[in-house]
Design a protein with these regions (language model features):
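Mg2+-dependent phosphoryl-transfer enzymes with acidic/Ser/Thr/Gly-rich catalytic loops
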Residues: 2-6, 23, 166, 173-246
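Conserved acidic, metal-coordinating active-site core of Asp-based
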Residues: 96, 100-205, 214
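Short, structured coil segments at secondary-structure junctions
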Residues: 58-60, 67-68, 150-151, 205-206, ...
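Residue-level detector of anion-binding/catalytic polar loops
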Residues: 39, 103, 154, 208-209, ...
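Residue-level signal for inorganic ion chemistry
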Residues: 33, 44, 68, 130, ...
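Active-site residues of response regulator receiver
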Residues: 10
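Active-site phosphate-binding/coordination module
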Residues: 21-118
Length: 246
């Protein structure tokens, strides 16, 4: 094994292609990394139930980071830490979504709600993340400017057309740092790969930060390396060219 001991992989736009599938090429090289002793960690904005099938497909029994770091798992189904988003803030975020008439969603610890199906009692629910989606960028920017004036929020995105909100301090980077503490690794031994703003902190904090070829420009600017796109098996390229190169 080379100098990198942990490979943190975003899912959408990174490990997954446009059909939300792991290509055979990516799967093969992830298995090569695992067999070489590298810890492969799924690191995603998705909730655990949505991320789990991909970890299972790759036969990973390693730590997982879900809802942008809101949950850290020592291995699938074994929760290490969970950081909640204040329900009063979710009420305000929800009201702003209604005001602008945009699509929105929220993750609680046991369900996902959205514009078509919202929770009956926001206050008593245990929230992890809230998000907005619209292709009307002026409206999206208006929402962003508003919530940037509020305290206690960590604001990122997972596409140019959404905004994702966690509790302040929650990020894939802080979660990766905790995973490293759990495993006895140093952040310099981490390769973090992603395509969106919710990946930037981890990309900057890791020994090797990698942006996908399809990544947003800010992500490419933050990364040390740009690999192929999610349609070109960019993750496999990272494993071949950096993770398993001794």
């Amino acid at each position: 094994m080379g100098k990198y001991r942990l490979l943190a992989l975003d899912l959408d736009g990174t490990l997954l292609n446009d059909r939300s599938e792991i290509s055979n090429t990516n799967a093969k090289w992830v298995r090569h990394a695992v067999e070489a002793g590298v810890t492969v960690c799924v690191s995603t904005g998705r909730g655990f139930p949505s991320a789990l099938p991909f970890a299972e497909q790759l036969r990973l029994d390693t730590p997982m980071i879900t809802v942008n770091g809101g949950e850290i798992w020592t291995k699938p189904h074994s929760l290490h830490r969970r950081t909640l988003l204040d329900s009063q803030k979710v009420m305000k975020l929800h009201a702003l979504a209604e005001q602008h008439d945009v699509w929105f969603w929220g993750y609680t610890t046991n369900d996902i709600y959205n514009k078509e199906r919202w929770v009956g009692d926001t206050i008593t629910s245990h929230w992890l993340k809230f998000g907005y989606y619209t292709e009307n960028l002026p409206i999206l920017n208006e929402i962003l400017k508003e919530i940037q004036t509020w305290d206690g929020l960590e604001i990122t995105n997972s596409s140019p057309y959404n905004i994702e909100i966690n509790s302040q301090g929650v990020s894939k980077a802080s979660a990766l740092e905790e995973v490293c503490r759990m495993l006895g690794y140093d952040m310099s031994e981490v390769v973090a790969v992603g395509d969106s703003l919710n990946d930037i902190a981890a990309i900057r904090a890791s020994g090797l930060g990698v942006a996908m070829g399809n990544a947003q420009d800010e992500v490419k600017a933050a990364a040390k390396v740009v690999t192929g796109s999610h349609q070109e098996h960019g993750v496999a390229q990272v494993i071949q060219n950096y993770v398993l190169r001794t």
